[in-house]
Curated annotation (Swiss-Prot):
Its main location: cytoplasm. InterPro entries: DHS-like_NAD/FAD-binding_dom (IPR029035), NAD-dep_sirtuin_deacylases (IPR050134), Sirtuin (IPR003000), Sirtuin_cat_small_dom_sf (IPR026591), Sirtuin_class_U (IPR028628), Ssirtuin_cat_dom (IPR026590). NCBIfam families: PRK00481.1-1, PRK00481.1-3. Belongs to the sirtuin family. Class U subfamily. The active site is at residue 122. Binds 1 zinc ion per subunit. GO terms for molecular function: histone deacetylase activity, NAD-dependent; NAD+ binding; zinc ion binding. This is NAD-dependent protein deacetylase. It comes from Clostridium tetani (strain Massachusetts / E88). Its EC number is 2.3.1.286. GO terms for cellular component: cytoplasm. Gene3D superfamilies: SIR2/SIRT2 'Small Domain, TPP-binding domain. It catalyses: N(6)-acetyl-L-lysyl-[protein] + NAD(+) + H2O = 2''-O-acetyl-ADP-D-ribose + nicotinamide + L-lysyl-[protein]. Keywords: Cytoplasm, Metal-binding, NAD, Transferase, Zinc.
Amino acid sequence: MDTRKNLKELIKSSSNIVFFGGAGVSTESNIPDFRSEEGLYKTKSNFSYSPEVMLSHSFFKEHTEDFFDFYKEKMIYKYAKPNLAHHALAKLEKVGKLKAIITQNIDGLHQLAGSKNVIELHGGVGRNYCMDCNKFFDLNYILNNKEVVPKCDVCGGIVKPDVVLYEEPLNMDNINNAVRYVENSDVLIVGGTSLVVYPAANLIHYYKGNKLVLINKSSTPYDRKAQIVINDSIGSILGGIVEELGY
């Protein structure tokens, strides 16, 4: 069975596609994922705590300077550019085929590629808010701030990135929005995620159709439920297909 050809036909024939993606979408933009052998959780660093600990709400509260040291070094990739997957998805949205992108990533590369309807389950590095007065700050304010801990230029409060840390709940509006898109989609393409991070991985259970596509370099717990499984680079697969279709 030519899975790539089948995916091409699905994309060609559908105008109600939803994409759900994880860290593997951005690894081709040289942003490391979390759980692979080269991922953030496996590689050695100069920090005294594990990434899981440092990316927790309690660590942010108790060791705010250490949090920002880690965050600025390991979570922000200001020179990263959208890759073939990001551009392909933006084109599919532009021609009216893709209705929403649901992402676990915080890098903002989908928007940089031109995608409009992006649901960021774990937040985004481009949004930062004063914890006291709620003033908005962009990423440059964090990067260019001379202090390790960025402070609000109005009230002096700590400026916290709008990313979901461990021990923090996901935004229920985003979850409900994502569920609605998944439930109503004709084709659900899941890419670059091992589907082991909950509650985000639960989204797949809301899909009611019979055109589930999984594109990931390694197998996932949901492979047997999918109509199409492709263990390959999501950028080369989606990028190639979208180019062939002339979108």
